[in-house]
């Protein structure tokens, strides 16, 4: 997650030892909040994974809050986040603000059951994995890549079906093309557990 092109606010904390300045995201990390903003890339995934592992080392028994506003991106990068979410001991609660599309929606659905949320005007989109960039080369190589893509598609559909409590056939049908959902529709589908109007509506 890079904010190099934006002015990142700084928070000043005072203690008996004086003042200390944090950028806003480091301060929120102290509250166990992790952000995925923008495309899922190797770089953004590495940052998320590092923060998840750090928060586990700080307190393995306290929930982590994973906020997602992402159009999706790399499957392999996203799976590194997914595997880490399952590997660490703390529950990972997911929350969509803005949008969670493609791999973003997959990660949203992978939060701890009962702790997956979206804000009311969020947009969620699921679809089948795409080949990024131009695929060229020999016909046999293209065939190998096509078989691999089909295996990835089957794996993602199977995992998302488990998280949504749906049959694999439902996911195969519903991800065949871009499938956009409102927050309420995502709840009905099983991608999230609750739409949050405000903090007071949070039910755990």
From Swiss-Prot:
<keyword id="KW-0963">Cytoplasm</keyword>
<dbReference type="GO" id="GO:0005737">
    <property type="term" value="C:cytoplasm"/>
</dbReference>
<comment type="subunit">
    <text>Fourteen ClpP subunits assemble into 2 heptameric rings which stack back to back to give a disk-like structure with a central cavity, resembling the structure of eukaryotic proteasomes.</text>
</comment>
<comment type="similarity">
    <text>Belongs to the peptidase S14 family.</text>
</comment>
<dbReference type="InterPro" id="IPR023562">
    <property type="entry name" value="ClpP/TepA"/>
</dbReference>
<feature type="active site" description="Nucleophile">
    <location>
        <position position="102"/>
    </location>
</feature>
<protein>
    <recommendedName>
        <fullName>ATP-dependent Clp protease proteolytic subunit</fullName>
        <ecNumber>3.4.21.92</ecNumber>
    </recommendedName>
</protein>
<keyword id="KW-0378">Hydrolase</keyword>
<dbReference type="GO" id="GO:0009368">
    <property type="term" value="C:endopeptidase Clp complex"/>
</dbReference>
<dbReference type="InterPro" id="IPR029045">
    <property type="entry name" value="ClpP/crotonase-like_dom_sf"/>
</dbReference>
<dbReference type="InterPro" id="IPR001907">
    <property type="entry name" value="ClpP"/>
</dbReference>
<dbReference type="InterPro" id="IPR018215">
    <property type="entry name" value="ClpP_Ser_AS"/>
</dbReference>
<dbReference type="InterPro" id="IPR033135">
    <property type="entry name" value="ClpP_His_AS"/>
</dbReference>
<feature type="active site">
    <location>
        <position position="127"/>
    </location>
</feature>
<comment type="function">
    <text>Cleaves peptides in various proteins in a process that requires ATP hydrolysis. Has a chymotrypsin-like activity. Plays a major role in the degradation of misfolded proteins.</text>
</comment>
<dbReference type="GO" id="GO:0004176">
    <property type="term" value="F:ATP-dependent peptidase activity"/>
</dbReference>
<dbReference type="Pfam" id="PF00574">
    <property type="entry name" value="CLP_protease"/>
</dbReference>
<keyword id="KW-0645">Protease</keyword>
<keyword id="KW-0720">Serine protease</keyword>
<dbReference type="GO" id="GO:0051117">
    <property type="term" value="F:ATPase binding"/>
</dbReference>
<dbReference type="GO" id="GO:0006515">
    <property type="term" value="P:protein quality control for misfolded or incompletely synthesized proteins"/>
</dbReference>
<dbReference type="GO" id="GO:0004252">
    <property type="term" value="F:serine-type endopeptidase activity"/>
</dbReference>
């Amino acid at each position: 997650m890079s904010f190099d092109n934006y002015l990142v606010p700084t928070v000043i904390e005072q203690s008996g030892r004086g003042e200390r300045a944090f950028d806003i995201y480091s301060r929120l990390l102290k509250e166990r909040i992790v952000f995925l903003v923008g495309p899922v890339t190797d770089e953004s995934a590495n940052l998320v994974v590092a923060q998840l592992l750090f928060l586990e080392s700080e307190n393995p028994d306290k929930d982590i809050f994973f906020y997602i506003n992402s159009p999706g991106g790399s499957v392999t990068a996203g799976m590194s986040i997914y595997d880490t979410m399952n590997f660490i001991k703390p529950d990972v609660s997911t929350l969509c603000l803005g949008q969670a599309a493609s791999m973003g929606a997959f990660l949203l659905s992978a939060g701890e059951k009962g702790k997956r949320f979206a804000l009311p005007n969020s947009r969620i989109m699921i679809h089948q994995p795409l080949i990024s960039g131009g695929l060229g080369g020999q016909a046999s190589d293209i065939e190998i890549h096509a078989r691999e893509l089909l295996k990835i598609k089957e794996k993602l559909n199977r995992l998302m079906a488990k998280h949504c409590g749906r049959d694999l056939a439902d996911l195969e049908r519903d991800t065949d093309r871009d499938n956009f959902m409102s927050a309420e529709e995502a709840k009905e589908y099983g991608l999230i557990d609750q739409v949050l109007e405000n903090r007071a509506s949070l039910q755990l």
